[in-house]
UniProtKB/Swiss-Prot annotation:
Protein's gene: sfsA
Family according to the record: Belongs to the SfsA family.
Protein name: Sugar fermentation stimulation protein homolog
Any one GO MF annotation of this record: DNA binding
Transmembrane segments: none
Entry-linked InterPro entries: SfsA, SfsA_C, SfsA_N
Top-level taxon of origin: Bacteria
Pfam family membership, one: SfsA
Organism: Synechococcus sp. (strain CC9311)
């Protein structure tokens, strides 16, 4: 399935990033010279993908329910081999992307045949958390345990190794603990969504969040599965590049 288009969409508009500010906002100059303020769904530091003066792709989606008619979707970044590549920076997209990948059978070898997929299902202590995806195995599957999938958008890298997180994330720490607590009655699966095509492996971002790194290794030792899923980004689609290897420590 490598190279298969997983998501398609209307052609994005290209421009140049002028600045990002107030976490949620960025100014972009489009090719026609128009300067627009776009919504930035990624509220983190965006290490490695925030390059004022660099090329970006934005989506025009005006709606009475939205304050801004534009959304920042992709950024052109230096790749691990010294060339340039496109990265997906919209953190609202990975859950949809991974769901589409599972529905297309892209993770059948790792997850087995799947009968149903549910999103944002309550779980965890007092059911106060919501799992990104809850999978019910098909009746033909050897392992009939429910599969809890937590998705993390990943754009930071060191060389050709993708890293998550790029800042301290107490929420991410909690998710690792909750996935571990599901075992052995269910399968806990962490899916780093590698939103850049130039990486060959994934590791926890210990330098940004040492506790997350420790919890990551504890979770793996306990049986939590890690499936780093890599994608390449185009102006009108996102393609599947395969599952990458896991490095418990960089």
């Amino acid at each position: 399935m490598t190279g298969t288009s997983i998501l398609q969409f209307p052609v994005l508009s290209e421009g140049v990033l002028l600045k990002r500010y107030k976490r949620f906002l960025a100014d972009v100059e489009l090719k026609d010279g128009q300067v627009v303020t776009v919504h930035c769904a990624n509220t983190g530091p965006m290490k490695g993908v925030l390059h004022p003066g660099g090329r970006v792709r934005v989506r025009h989606a005006p709606s009475p329910k939205r304050k801004l008619a534009w959304t920042w979707e992709q950024a052109e970044i230096p790749s691990s081999d010294g060339t340039l590549c496109w990265a997906g920076i919209n953190t609202a997209l990975p859950n949809k992307l991974i769901r589409a990948l599972i529905e297309a059978g892209g993770l059948k070898d790792q997850l087995g045949p799947i009968k149903t997929i549910r999103a944002e299902v309550p779980y965890g202590l007092n059911r106060r958390s919501r799992i990104d995806l809850l999978l019910t195995p098909d009746d033909s599957a050897d392992d009939q345990r429910p599969i809890y999938v937590e998705v993390k958008n990943t754009t930071w890298s060191h060389g050709d190794v993708a890293l998550f997180p790029d800042t301290v994330t107490e929420r991410g720490q909690k998710h690792l603990e909750e996935l571990t607590a599901l075992l052995p009655d269910a399968r806990g699966v962490l899916v780093p969504c590698l939103s850049r095509p130039d990486v060959i492996a994934f590791a926890p971002g210990d330098s940004a969040d040492p506790r997350y790194g420790d919890l990551f290794r504890q979770a793996m030792a306990a049986g939590v599965e890690v499936l780093p899923c890599c994608f390449s980004f185009y102006e009108d689609q996102i393609q599947w590049e395969g599952v990458r290897t896991v490095c418990p420590r960089l």
